[in-house]
Each structure stands twice: as structure tokens, then as C-alpha cells.
Regions:
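Metal-dependent nuclease catalytic cores that hydrolyze phosphodiester bonds in DNA/RNA
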Residues: 1-78, 108
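Mg2+/Mn2+-dependent nuclease catalytic core
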Residues: 57-154
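Conserved pre-motif I regulatory segment
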Residues: 173-220
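A substrate-engagement module of RecA-like helicase motors
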Residues: 178, 185, 243-359, 367, ...
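Signature of the SF2 helicase/ATPase Hel1-core->accessory helical subdomain module
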Residues: 231, 237, 258, 341-358, ...
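A contiguous, basic/glycine-rich beta-loop/short-helix subdomain that forms a polymer-engagement track
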Residues: 334-359, 369-376, 502-622, 629-632, ...
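Conserved RecA-like P-loop NTPase helicase motor core
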Residues: 619-630, 681-793
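Conserved helicase motor "Helicase C" RecA-like lobe of SF1/SF2 P-loop NTPases
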Residues: 655-680
Length: 827
């Protein structure tokens, strides 16, 4: 029997953790601050103190061989010659309330490390020391207990005996899982064209010899071939061969999570003996069973019965779920279990994930530096990553590593705090004055209406004279300054320093006044401050600082222009990663921005008959901003020709809501007999579903929907058959020119000379190709794609067309379009 690998912390917390979920403000970033203080205490201990000592040992309980491992915070020999295991804990608990028996888990960790080290070194006795560091007062309290090795070994053995039934359950499951996955058959009678090739690529990536940074694969596969099953099936087969312990299916939106759930359900339906546990991770706000009056989770034991006593009941809930035999733990199943056992569904799904084989969730569970799953990704593991709709990852990753802070947050906090003097009020005022001076500096550097710009001094700094109320402030040299926005390559330390100084008094106030009326507003401010300060710690040459003056407000953004090193680091936590989409063109662009320059990239051709797709372009229409007014009428005429060619459902995609609205108003005035439907901004899930329901099969009347490229209907929508028989794409999808996009352009111009491509052309054409992919979804589908813009005839854009667009026809005018459409539908 293979040894059961068991981290010390997992063993101790699983068995001994008790009590409730309590998300009240604790005053510090536990992970980052705790690690910093650990290093501080370890360094202060001096010579002879060994820090972060890796320990591993073999033990047996109930016939199960265990490998127990972990890192002891410190090991040293005291003046009496006794070996001491030091366990360091950082706490916000007031020093007077810190007790020796405050947390049994703390002693247990030290005692297990003592057992491992004692046997390893042949010691007869050891001491275990708990070192508590109080983060507000810097008080250090230490407690020491004396043990014989025999006592420590007995303690560890007792823990293992308690854990053994859980280990046995998991070992039996893994054996059963391995047998079933190795024999898993493809759940359909035959592969669709292209599916076998895609599955083969993914299987080879997952079973390749592990490397330090993991194997990377980029797969472009046409819409409609069944990508979800084509990547899931081979990855699961790889796990069946022993290549991979868990599979993480990561998505950009909920709709693709459902696709993964459905694919796994299909595998279960086709194989009644399939042993597979899957869990879908859903945001806390969406699964909360006991929100407060404003609809937000209230994770306090005195307010939520599902938080109160959670750790006392969660293992009972886990046992019931793991033994129920279904293995499918989606949102509905978890809600039922949470109600049955009175446990928080969000924390339950996280705890359950450690016992599951497939984990389905948003990108942020792997890539976001704040909310990623530390239990899996703080160190590398035998994980397989499937990244769906990977064309969305560059922008999502940029957003995850960026941060913003507004002066208005300080103003609102001051207002909420009210009158009176306090340390916090003073710190708020200093930060507010710094941002006020920053706003004035930006307004001078980047005047909106003809004001003269300031000049740099010899140091490269921009200095502005202040006043008694508003002191002078220095900003780094501006790399870009226009229309109220300034970009700097260096951090604006003059703005960040007062925010850093605000942290301590803000923490103190939040801890001391938890019931104050202003608590919610100041807690929001605290998190905003922490967010921007964390981003400042990551800040390097891949970032730019954006300062924007809007009226009386100043917005500071630390923008991640290039997320490649951060994505690379996240993917390195696993064995292999397959990133797939219908649109990963050009592949070099995606490999570069996602930190995988050496990754293998494959592009599969469309399996669908070319004659089923009518593909036309009217290059006589220009949708450039200056020609938009002149383009409205010709676009309406082209849309009318498309929608009148055959009764059915159509979609027209535009680069913006404003442009959409202009054309829609003209179209409905001139073609009132054609039914229309407009995508409104900010649609929720219900609104999205209602919109799509209008695209019914076998329509008796024509419906023309107006949507936005890159929006919720421009991708991730499956309208097969005659639910959608045509779409028009207005423009080449270029992002709107903005200071941010210009900084992206400048950055990549400096990197590789392709700034316009990286910032505008390639992201825009991705939206075009995604929108066009809504039309042909199955082998039997027949439909039309109409391109409306003269730039589609330019080689820089045409070279980005997929191979199955070789038959694209460029037409002279609407009259010729009508004839082509008539002929297409007559065939």
C-alpha cells in the first residue's frame, strides 16, 4: 500500500479545530503580516536557531503507512542542553487575554514536530515552546511545556488513529477512482471531427514528464466541436494512469462552469461505475443562506447559525457527503447539505474540495493573489489545470494584479467619522491633503482645457508649489499626460506614504469601535487601502501608475500592463495546464501575455462544411469614429438585407452601446416591420436568460437582436440549430482609445514593436471571431456571417481570419448582398 502523505497542519486542524467562523475585523493581513513577523522573530533568535526546518517521518496506524511532513518554525537548544521546538503564532488577541491553552491546535503542531524531530535525532526528551506575537503592541508571550519522546510519539499516534478512517476512505477511493478512470470510455458513439485530435494533445500534455514550471499547452479549437468534453475526458484518463492528483477546471463565467458540470454528468451517465467526485466553487455572496438586511454575508457566530459552531459540525457533513455515492457536489447539492447540517455552504465547498477529484471554479481561485486557494497553491502540487475561454485571461489577469484608490473614499470616511479630534482623523486629513495636492498636480500636468502644464526639474520630478492648506507634492516624471490623466512608470510614493501611515490608526479604530455607525464605511476604506498597498508591493517594470483628476476627485490606479510573470508563477503550481478557446489568434500573442513563450500551440480546423456558412463583407462601409454618422444608414440597410433574406433569428454586434443605439433608432424608424431586441447594459443572470429565450427554435417571425461585441452575448452563448441563423459584425472591435490602452501600446512597442497589435488590433479581432462563432454550432447548422467595415479587407486584419473563412466574399453594395443571400438560402 502506498504511503498516505499528510501535512502536519492538515492533520492537526482537521481533528482539533473547533468553534465558529468569525469574519469580524482582526486588524491585519494574517498571511503576509504573519510571515513577516515569523521572519523577524527567527532572525532575532540569533545563531543556533534553525528556522523553517523541514521535517518528515514515516508512521503507521490501523495498517495504513503515513508520511507526515511539515516545517517547524524554529528549532534550537536551550542553556540546559534541551532541544526546543518553537511554534510561532501571530495574534490580534490582546496580550492580557492570551492564555497558554488558547488554541489546542497550536500545541498540537509543536508536539507533532517534536515527535518527528525527536525520533529523527534519537532524543529522549524535548520542549515545545509557543511564541505569541501581539501585532498591535509588539508584546511577545512564550509558554513552554516539557515532554518525553514517548509522550510525543503517543500523542502523534493517537492523532493518526483518529485520522485513519478518513485516510482509509480516501485511499480506497483513490484506488477505485484509478481503476474506473483508466477504463473510462468516451461517452459518445464517435468523436466529432477534431475532438480526437484535441483530446490527444491534452492527454499528451497531462502525461508528459513533469517539469519545474509545468507543461503548458495552448489549444485553439472551433466553436461547436465539443471542447469541454475533449479536454475533460483525456485529463481524467491521465489521472487514471497516475498523472495528476486533482483536476482544476477554471472558467471566466458561470455559463462555462455549467458546461463542465454537464460534461461530467454525461460521463457519469455513460459509466455507472465511474468513481469521480466533483465540486463547483461558487462565490460566497451567491451561496450565502443567511445574508444581512442588505443582502451581504454576515459571517459572525452571533448573527449566522451556519457560521456558529461550523468547525464542530463540518466533519460530520463531510462524511455524509463523501459517503453518499453521487460524487456530484454542485451549488444545489451543497445548499441542501449546508441546511441539513447547519454549516456555511461556502466554507463547506472549500473544505470539501480537498476530498474531490475535479474542482470547477472561476479563474481567481488560481490566479488572483488575494483569493487564490492557498490550501492548494501556496506550494506546487500534482495538479492539472484546464483553462476555459483562455482568450479572456489576459484582461482578467491584468485586473487581478491591478488596484485602484480614490480620494473620494477618504472624503466619505471623514464624513462618516464626524467631527472631533483623534489619531485616525489626523491621519485621514493628512492622506486627504496629499490626494488633494495630487489632484492639483495632475490638473496642472494634464490640463483638460488649455491650462499650461508644469515642467520637470533636473531630478525628473514634477514639483508644484503648495499652500498652508495643501502642501507641495512631488510626483514621478510623467510618461504620459493628457486630458486629466497622468501616467508614471515609478510609484507615486508621495500618495502611498500617507495611506501606509493611515493603516495603523485605522486598524486600531476598527478594533476598538466594532459597533460604531461609521464602522462599515471605514472597513471599506481599510480594504481599499490594503488593496492598493498590496499592489504597490508587487509593482515593478510590468506596471504603470495612472492618476486621473475628475472634478474634485483623484483616482490612483496601479495598472498591471503585463501579467505574464504572475500568470506563469500561478501555472507553475501544477503539473500541466491546457489553455483552450475558439479564438487564440495569433498564438504568439497569447503565449507572450500569459507567460508561456515556449508552450506548444495547436490550432484545429473547423469540422463543419464550409458551404453551410455564408460569409460576406461590405468593405464600402467605414465604422471609424469620424465616419460613424455617415455609416448609420448603410449599416441599417445591410442589416435589413440580412434579416429579410430568410425568416429567422439574427444578431448584430456593435463596438459600443452608443453606436448600437444610434443604428437601432435609425433601423426601427426605417424598417418597423422587422422585430428587434436590444441588449441593455448591466443585465443580470435573469435578464440574460430572458434575452436568450426570445431566440426560440422554429421562429415564425424574424427577430434581429442588437448586442455588444465582447459582451455577454458575444461569446459563451450556444444558440444551435435555427435559434440563430445569422449575425452581422459592425467594425473590427478595437478597444476605445484611452490613456490605459495607449500605455499598453507604448509598453509593448518598447517590448517588441507591436504595441498597436497588442493593445488594439488583436484584442479587437478576438471579439469579432468570438461573435462570428455564435452562428455555426453543429454539423447540421446553416447560417450567415456579415462583416461591415473596410478594414476587414486589409491584410493586417484578414491574416487573422481562421482557415475555414477562405471563402469570404467581398461585395460591392447592399444590392449584391441581397442577391448573394438569396442564392445562399436557395441552395
Amino acid at each position: 500500500m502506498p504511503a498516505f502523505r499528510l501535512p502536519v497542519r492538515q492533520l492537526v486542524e482537521f481533528l482539533l479545530r473547533t468553534g465558529s467562523i468569525d469574519s469580524r475585523f482582526t486588524g491585519f493581513d494574517r498571511a503576509n503580516e504573519g510571515a513577516r513577523i515569523h521572519r523577524k522573530l527567527q532572525k532575532a533568535a540569533g545563531e543556533g536557531y534553525a528556522a523553517e526546518v523541514f521535517l518528515s517521518g514515516e508512521r503507521e496506524a490501523a495498517g495504513i503507512p503515513f508520511t507526515i511532513e511539515g516545517r517547524a518554525d524554529g528549532i534550537f537548544t536551550d542553556e540546559a542542553g534541551v532541544t526546543v521546538i518553537d511554534e510561532i503564532k501571530t495574534t490580534a488577541v490582546p496580550a492580557d487575554d492570551i492564555a497558554e491553552d488558547m488554541n489546542p491546535c497550536h500545541w498540537a503542531q509543536g508536539m507533532v514536530y517534536g515527535a518527528l524531530y525527536g525520533r529523527q535525532q534519537g532524543l529522549e526528551k524535548l520542549d515545545v515552546r509557543l511564541t505569541y506575537y501581539q501585532i498591535d503592541t509588539d508584546d511577545i508571550l512564550r509558554f513552554v511545556r516539557h515532554f518525553t519522546l514517548e509522550e510525543l510519539e503517543a500523542f502523534l499516534q493517537d492523532l493518526l488513529e483518529q485520522y485513519a478512517p478518513w485516510a482509509q476512505r480516501q485511499l480506497a477511493w483513490k484506488e477505485r477512482r484509478g481503476v474506473s478512470l483508466s477504463a473510462l470510455d468516451f461517452p459518445f458513439p464517435a468523436y466529432r471531427p477534431g475532438q480526437r485530435a484535441l483530446a490527444g494533445e491534452v492527454y499528451r500534455a497531462c502525461t508528459a514528464a513533469p517539469s519545474k514550471s509545468g507543461v503548458r499547452l495552448f489549444c485553439q479549437a472551433p466553436t461547436g466541436i465539443g471542447k469541454t468534453m475533449s479536454v475533460l475526458f483525456p485529463a481524467l484518463r491521465a489521472i487514471g494512469t497516475g498523472c495528476g492528483e486533482k483536476l482544476f477546471y477554471l472558467t471566466a463565467r458561470n455559463t462555462t462552469q455549467s458546461a463542465a458540470e454537464d460534461a461530467i454528468a454525461r460521463l457519469r451517465a455513460s459509466d455507472s461505475k465511474l468513481a469521480l467526485r466533483s465540486v463547483t466553487l461558487t462565490a460566497k455572496e451567491k451561496v450565502c443562506l443567511h445574508p444581512d438586511a442588505e443582502g451581504h454575508p454576515a459571517c459572525l457566530p452571533e448573527l449566522c447559525p451556519y457560521a456558529n459552531g461550523y468547525y464542530d459540525r463540518v466533519n460530520t457533513a463531510l462524511k455524509a457527503l463523501l459517503d453518499d455515492g453521487t460524487g456530484r457536489f454542485d451549488r444545489a447539492a451543497l445548499a441542501d447539505a449546508a441546511k441539513q447540517f447547519t454549516v456555511c455552504p461556502f466554507e463547506l465547498e472549500l473544505d470539501l474540495s480537498e476530498w474531490c477529484d475535479v474542482i470547477i471554479g472561476d479563474y481567481n481561485y488560481l490566479f488572483d493573489p488575494v483569493v487564490h486557494l492557498r490550501r492548494f497553491f501556496d506550494s506546487a502540487g500534482d495538479w492539472l489545470f484546464l483553462v476555459d475561454e483562455a482568450h479572456n485571461l489576459p484582461e482578467r489577469a491584468r485586473a487581478m494584479y491591478s488596484a485602484r484608490f480614490c480620494k473620494s473614499s477618504l472624503t466619505e470616511a471623514k464624513r462618516a467619522l464626524g467631527r472631533g479630534k483623534s489619531t485616525l482623523k489626523t491621519a485621514l486629513s493628512k492622506a486627504d491633503k496629499a490626494f488633494l495636492a495630487g489632484r492639483k498636480a495632475v490638473s496642472t500636468l494634464a490640463p483638460r482645457r488649455g491650462s499650461t502644464a508644469a515642467e520637470e526639474d533636473d531630478s525628473g520630478q514634477t514639483s508644484l508649489l503648495g499652500s498652508a492648506e495643501t502642501p507641495a507634492i512631488e510626483l514621478p516624471a510623467a510618461d504620459y499626460a493628457q486630458d486629466g490623466t497622468v501616467f508614471c512608470k515609478e510609484l507615486p510614493s508621495a500618495l502611498l506614504a500617507p495611506l501606509r501611515a493611515l493603516t495603523a490608526p485605522l486598524q486600531d479604530w476598527l478594533e476598538d469601535d466594532p459597533d460604531a455607525e461609521a464602522h462599515a464605511a471605514l472597513l471599506d476604506l481599510y480594504f481599499e487601502v490594503q488593496d492598493i498597498l498590496r499592489a504597490s508591493e508587487r509593482y515593478d517594470e510590468h506596471f504603470a501608475a495612472q492618476l486621473t483628476a475628475r472634478g474634485s476627485d483623484l483616482e490612483l490606479q496601479l495598472l498591471c500592463l503585463d501579467p505574464s510573470p504572475f500568470v506563469d508563477a500561478s501555472l507553475s503550481a501544477g503539473r500541466a495546464a491546457a489553455l483552450f478557446s475558439a479564438t487564440l489568434t495569433p498564438p504568439g500573442y497569447y503565449r507572450t501575455v500569459l507567460g508561456c513563450p515556449e508552450a506548444r500551440a495547436v490550432a484545429l480546423e473547423s469540422p463543419f462544411p464550409a458551404e453551410n456558412l455564408g460569409l460576406y463583407c461590405l468593405p464600402s462601409i467605414s465604422t471609424r469614429y469620424r465616419q460613424r454618422d455617415a455609416s448609420i444608414r448603410p449599416i441599417s440597410d445591410a442589416l435589413a438585407a440580412l434579416a429579410s433574406s430568410r425568416v429567422g433569428n439574427y444578431l448584430a454586434f456593435f463596438p459600443s452601446y452608443a453606436y448600437l443605439r444610434q443604428v437601432w433608432e435609425d433601423f426601427t424608424a426605417r424598417y418597423p416591420d422587422i422585430g428587434t431586441l436590444v441588449q441593455e447594459s448591466g443585465l443580470d443572470d435573469a435578464g440574460r436568460a430572458a434575452f436568450l429565450e426570445r431566440f426560440s427554435p422554429c421562429p415564425e417571425k424574424t427577430l434581429l437582436g442588437f448586442g455588444v461585441m465582447g459582451g455577454i452575448f458575444g461569446e459563451g452563448v450556444d444558440l444551435a440549430g435555427d435559434r440563430l441563423i445569422g449575425c452581422a459584425i459592425v467594425g473590427v472591435g478595437l478597444p476605445q482609445v484611452s490613456p490605459r490602452q495607449e500605455m499598453l501600446r507604448r509598453y509593448y512597442d518598447a517590448q517588441n514593436g507591436a504595441g498597436f497589435d497588442y493593445a488594439y488590433r488583436w484584442p479587437g479581432m478576438n471579439k469579432v471571431l468570438q461573435a462570428a462563432g455564435r452562428v455555426i454550432r453543429t454539423q447540421e447548422d446553416k447560417g450567415v456571417v456579415l462583416l461591415l467595415d473596410d478594414r476587414f479587407a486589409q491584410s493586417e486584419y484578414a491574416r487573422l481570419f481562421p482557415k475555414h473563412w477562405r471563402h469570404l466574399e467581398y461585395l460591392r453594395d447592399t444590392k449584391e448582398l441581397k442577391k448573394k443571400l438569396e442564392d445562399f438560402w436557395a441552395e
